[in-house]
Amino acid sequence: MTQLEFIEQIIKEKEAVILDANDKIWSYAELPYEETRSSALLCSILESEGFTVETGVAEIPTAFVARYVVGTGKPVMGILGEFDALATLSQKAGCTVKDPVQNGGSGHG
């Protein structure tokens, strides 16, 4: 099995969890620095997968770092994930024309 095939297999195995998290984060539509439910959800998922999670990073309550160490801990990979919503961009998921969930509400539109 190639490394790419291994990664594809893991993604397929975790597909339901990934899609559920995506849908929940979309529906929460939390503004910057207020992503408490989204952050808690992601931390919970990462912890259940064996990651060590540090919350409140840089004195931001919703910021976190998740670490998963195997062997020597090398190489190191960093990912920055943006999942906050923006004011007035409320939008129904899967819709390609403007169709807000709530007029003037926050969202990922």
Q: Where are these predicted regions, by residue range?
A:
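Acidic/His- and Gly-rich active-site-bordering loop/insert found
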Residues: 2-109
